[in-house]
């Protein structure tokens, strides 16, 4: 399938900077925020948001990692689910947890992530930040912070590449068979 770059590194950086500003504005500061990245690329995005928030507000925002493997509604269909550990370095009790992921599609990943977060404690609020919202929701979930809205068909795929994992920052769209 041919891939087409739709967002380059500079545009991706701008989108993350905009999300950082929105987080500050909507929360009247960031003292009670915990960023929780959904494995795998959500973690890199959460770390970048924390770095940008530190530059803007001079506050270290805790960043956690969330593995949702056992919370997925398709886990029974997997032969042997690959388990990773979740690591949230602070208590989330009474905090605002911002779940961070690369792409919002059906909403099922986010539903699983909310279940996983609730097993860690009782946050005051859960919000969602995504780099890309591609539409096609199957559950009533929406992102509070969106880097880019990229409408797709159901047969297309959004591919997010991150420097930390893939060697480059970019977002591509892969055309499926329509």
From Swiss-Prot:
Signal peptide: none annotated. GO terms for molecular function: RNA binding; uracil phosphoribosyltransferase activity. Substrate binds at residues 40-41, 101-109, 134. Disulfide bonds: none annotated. It holds the Pfam family Pribosyltran. A motif (PRPP-binding) lies at residues 97-109. Optimum pH is 9.2 for UPRTase activity. The keyword Cell inner membrane does not apply. It catalyses: UMP + diphosphate = 5-phospho-alpha-D-ribose 1-diphosphate + uracil. It comes from the Bacteria. Keywords: Glycosyltransferase, RNA-binding, Transcription, Transcription regulation, Transcription termination, Transferase. It is an enzyme of class 2 (transferase). InterPro entries: PRibTrfase_dom, PRTase-like, PyrR, PyrR_bifunctional. GO terms for biological process: DNA-templated transcription termination. The keyword Phosphoprotein does not apply. Its EC number is 2.4.2.9. Homodimer and homohexamer; in equilibrium. Regulates transcriptional attenuation of the pyrimidine nucleotide (pyr) operon in response to exogenous pyrimidines, by binding to the anti-antiterminator region of the 5' leader on pyr mRNA. This probably favors formation of a transcription terminator hairpin, leading to a reduced expression of downstream genes. Also displays a weak uracil phosphoribosyltransferase activity which is not physiologically significant. Belongs to the purine/pyrimidine phosphoribosyltransferase family. PyrR subfamily. HAMAP family: PyrR. This is Bifunctional protein pyrR. The lineage of its organism: Bacteria, Bacillati, Bacillota, Bacilli, Lactobacillales. The gene is pyrR.
């Amino acid at each position: 399938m041919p891939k087409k770059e739709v967002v380059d590194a500079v545009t991706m950086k701008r989108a993350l900077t905009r999300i950082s500003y929105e987080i500050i504005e909507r929360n009247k500061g960031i003292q009670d925020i915990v960023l929780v990245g959904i494995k795998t690329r959500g973690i890199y995005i959460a770390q970048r948001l924390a770095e940008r928030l530190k530059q803007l507000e001079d506050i270290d925002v805790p960043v956690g990692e969330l593995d949702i493997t056992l919370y997925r509604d398709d886990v029974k269909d997997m032969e042997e689910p690959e388990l990773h550990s979740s690591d949230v370095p602070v208590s989330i009790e009474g905090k605002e947890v911002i779940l961070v992921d690369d792409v919002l599609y059906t909403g099922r990943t986010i539903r699983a992530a909310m279940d996983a977060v609730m097993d860690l404690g009782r946050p005051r609020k859960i919000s969602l930040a995504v780099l890309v919202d591609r539409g096609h929701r199957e559950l009533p979930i929406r992102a509070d912070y969106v880097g880019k809205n990229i409408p797709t068909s159901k047969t297309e795929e959004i591919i997010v590449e991150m420097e930390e994992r893939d060697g480059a920052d970019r977002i591509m769209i892969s055309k499926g068979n329509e």
